[in-house]
Amino acid sequence: MPESAEAQVKEALLALLKDRDIQHITMKEIAEKAKVSRGSLYLYYEDKFSIIEDVIEDMKEGLGKALFDAFSHMDTLHLNKKRQTVHPTLSFVHEHRSFFSVMMNRGHFHRFFKDVFQQDVLLAPIHVNLTPIERDIYGHYRALYTYAIILYWLNEDAAASPEAISQKVWELVSQKRFYWLFGKAVPGEREKEKQIDRRVVRTREALQKAFLDVLAEKQDYAGITISDITRKSNIRRATFYDHYANKEELLQTMIQRSCAEIIDHLTIASSPNEFSLKEAEKALAILLSALSNMPIVHFLNREWGVPHVIPDMFKALESFYLHQQTDIHAEKKLYAHYVSAMIIGLLLYRLDEGKAHPPEVLAREFLQFLDVKKYKVVLL
């Protein structure tokens, strides 16, 4: 396929993805949008998924090259001395905005950045020779904070230039501290729960447990029906509708409940800047240990197709951090995005690659990166 036609096909799919999920887009629509014949399209692409995979690989290669070109002449990177430069990732996102605008709000897209950061350039803490586990955790950390920054830019400050966002980013990361992960309780967040009748609580808990059981059996969110849930819970269908309008509302309630539990583990009585590193390690290790018993574990399984989980987690965590009284001079909403991404990234790492490591090790290794301000540039 000529390069111009290939570019048209990719742009056509991205344009269609602005309004619909890829599951609801046909090859016929892509061909019509790109102004190519279906026959020509099928000569080069087996299906629509092979097109989006091709687009993603192009973007990974492009971003990797941009990072390599930006850092290959450097030995070190000091966050306090980069205020007048444009972040190379942000320049690339600006150049390919149509792709990132479509993809950023999709579940698990942070892995795009993790793949890129493992390919060409590694920014390692200046005085540390990273072990394999530290390198893996750090790659996840760097991927998530990049994801959070771009998410903030596209969703909260879309009119800003890459130069303006870069200045905000350097301002933020030059101040970063491990205790940013923690905060004080937000008044009134749990008052409604305390007032609910115990019988109502028991019924809802039974429905939620049944939903989890059915999800584990079917391993497909789309295939779950209200009848499945009521049969499993032995609760009448009419009773289900007394509590939830549909399975989506039930799911939202359970995600919010899990997020509240996560936030409980991050809530401390003292001011965060008085929290010691040892106390932070202990609190984070307890959260990682408790994670396996939370419903959110099932919802984060990519194979089961549960929608909106990561965006909903972002909203809950962002709200918690926005309510904190901080002495941070950077943009507060950017700070909330950044720290929320840190937590979500760590939890995702724990559920995937981090299963083999003790929670205490993950907590310790993760927290040490949050205070690093100076990095050595390692070409891979």
Swiss-Prot record:
InterPro entries, sorted: Homeodomain-like_sf, HTH-type_Tx_Regulator, HTH_TetR
Keywords: DNA-binding, Repeat, Repressor, Transcription, Transcription regulation
Every HTH tetR-type domain range: 3-63, 201-262
DNA-binding region: 225-244
Molecular function (Gene Ontology), one example: DNA-binding transcription factor activity
Domain of life: Bacteria
Keyword tRNA processing applies: no
Gene3D superfamilies: Tetracycline Repressor, domain 2 (1.10.357.10)
Alphabetized PROSITE patterns for the sequence: HTH_TETR_2 (PS50977)
Keyword Repressor in record: yes
Gene Ontology cellular component annotations, sorted alphabetically: protein-DNA complex
Protein's recorded name: Uncharacterized HTH-type transcriptional regulator YxbF
Organism: Bacillus subtilis (strain 168)
